[in-house]
Design a protein with these regions (language model features):
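Cofactor-binding loop segments of dinucleotide-utilizing enzymes, especially the Rossmann-like FAD-
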Residues: 96, 145, 172
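Active-site phosphate/pyrophosphate-binding segments
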Residues: 12-139
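Short, polar loop motifs at secondary-structure junctions
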Residues: 169-177
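Short, solvent-exposed amphipathic alpha-helical segments in soluble enzyme
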Residues: 105-113, 155-162, 184
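Active-site regions of enzymes building and remodeling cell-envelope glycoconjugates
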Residues: 12-15, 178-184
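A structural signal for short secondary-structure junctions
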Residues: 84-87, 133-136, 161-164, 177-181
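Short, small-residue-biased leader/transition segments that mark boundaries at the very start
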Residues: 1-11
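Glycine-rich, anion-gripping cofactor-binding loops and their flanking helix/strand elements
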Residues: 125-159
C-alpha cells in the first residue's frame, strides 16, 4: 500500500511504512513474511511442524533485515556489471519451483525501475519457444537455490549459454557449483 490513508491500509493487521517508489518491494516482502508466518502457525496447529523448526524459522525472519542489508552492499564488481549491461534492451529471468516466482518478481522489478524489457520463464518451459528468444549477449538471470531442481537448472543455464547469453547466477550463500556455469 503506497499511501497510509488508504482504507485497506487502515483495516490491515500488518503495519509497514509507506512505499516510496514504483517497485513495491516492502509490500512484496511483507506479503512473503506474512505468508510464512501463517504457514508456521498452520503447521504448528495441525502438528506437522515441530516447535524447534518453527523457532528456527522465526529466528530467520527476525534476521532478515540484516541479511537484506548485506545483499545490497554495492561493490565495484556490481557497479562494473551495471555499467556494462545497463544499456541492454532485454533481459530474461529463469527459475524452477519457488525460484520461478522470485524470477517473475525480479523481472517485474527490472521493468518498473529501468524500463528494460524483462520476462521470467520457468526453467522447465525453456525448450517450448522461450529458447528461441535467447540471443548473443542477452542477460539471463538464473536462479538456482532449490536443491531438488538444481541439476535441471544447471542444464537450463548450459542451454542459454550455448546460445551465447550472458548468465548471471543467483544461488545460495556458499554455493560454489553455480559459479562454474555462469558468467557472473
Amino acid at each position: 500500500i503506497s499511501v497510509s490513508a488508504f482504507l485497506l491500509n487502515r483495516s490491515s493487521d500488518l503495519r509497514f511504512c509507506p512505499e516510496i517508489s514504483v517497485a513495491s518491494t516492502k509490500a512484496y516482502t511483507t506479503q512473503l513474511v506474512a505468508g510464512l508466518l501463517f504457514a508456521v502457525y498452520l503447521g504448528q496447529l495441525n502438528g506437522k511442524l515441530d516447535a524447534a523448526l518453527a523457532k528456527e524459522i522465526l529466528i530467520g525472519i527476525h534476521e532478515l533485515p540484516e541479511l537484506i542489508h548485506t545483499i545490497f552492499e554495492v561493490d565495484e564488481d556490481m557497479k562494473a556489471f551495471a555499467k556494462h549491461y545497463g544499456f541492454k534492451t532485454d533481459a530474461f529471468f529463469l527459475g524452477r519451483s519457488i525460484d520461478y516466482a522470485v524470477a517473475m518478481e525480479g523481472a517485474l522489478k527490472l521493468k518498473e525501475i529501468s524500463y528494460i524489457h524483462a520476462e521470467a520463464y520457468a526453467g522447465g518451459e525453456l525448450k517450448h519457444g522461450t529458447l528461441a528468444l535467447i540471443e548473443e549477449g542477452v542477460p539471463v538471470i538464473a536462479l538456482a537455490t532449490q536443491e531438488d531442481v538444481f541439476d535441471k537448472m544447471i542444464s537450463n543455464i548450459r542451454e542459454v549459454k550455448a546460445r551465447e547469453a550472458v548468465v548471471i547466477g543467483i544461488g545460495m550463500k556458499g554455493d560454489e557449483e553455480i559459479a562454474k556455469h555462469v558468467d557472473h
